[in-house]
Amino acid sequence: ERTGGEFNHHNDFFTGRQGQEFASLQESYAYTYALGGMQIINHPGQYWSIDNTYSETQKDGPGWHANNFKTFPSLVGLEVYNQGDRRANDRILWDQILQRTMPTRNVFGYSGDDTHNNEQLFRNYNYMLMEDLTTEDLKDAMRKGESYFCYEPKGSGEGKAPRISAIEVDENSKTISIEANGLVHWIYATDKTSSAASSARSTIV
């Protein structure tokens, strides 16, 4: 769908589509859903402005995206880092979408190079937590959100991102536990009424 001279678009997976164009994004979502594929929305913050007020059904607003995620199970996530970190809007929009879909419908974040030349390589990537390197395991990881995204500003291709092997969410204790190798730097608020934050550094083995 063309918006302001660019295509408001998504990536398709497991469908064999050859770049067909549709009159609306919903038509494209429905087509991929019928084929049993999956989709990730590309840099949606480009088409949304935090300075504008959107109705819950207005195109490109958080309510509109949230409704699409609830309607089409084929939509598994959206880019929150794109071509480095071009648009912080992507993450703000992601948060507003999650406020409308959680806890019944999760929406997973992804990081994409959006590579148009060699200089744009190696900054954005995702680790998929898979038992085996198979298509079925990749599909399963995408459906369940068993992955984490990374952004390396310099794009050296040698960034030392933590290697996380497992993530466990405990709904009762409201905790997230991970198994990983590497250094993790946590930043968290000290209390709900204060804007002050503390940081803790721990080595995870």
Predicted feature residues:
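Anion (oxyanion) recognition and catalysis
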Residues: 33, 98-99, 103
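Short, exposed beta-strand/loop patches in secreted or surface proteins that constitute
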Residues: 20, 70, 165-169
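Generic recognition of flexible, low-complexity loop/linker segments
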Residues: 27-28, 66-67, 175-177
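A metal-dependent hydrolase metal-coordination microenvironment
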Residues: 1-57, 64, 73, 79-94, ...
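C-terminal functional module detector
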Residues: 101-108, 113-205
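Solvent-exposed residues in well-ordered beta-strands and their adjoining turns
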Residues: 58-60, 181
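Residues that flank catalytic or metal-binding motifs in active/ligand-binding sites
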Residues: 6-9, 35, 74, 105, ...
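Alpha-helix termination/capping residues and helix-transition junctions
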Residues: 69-72, 103
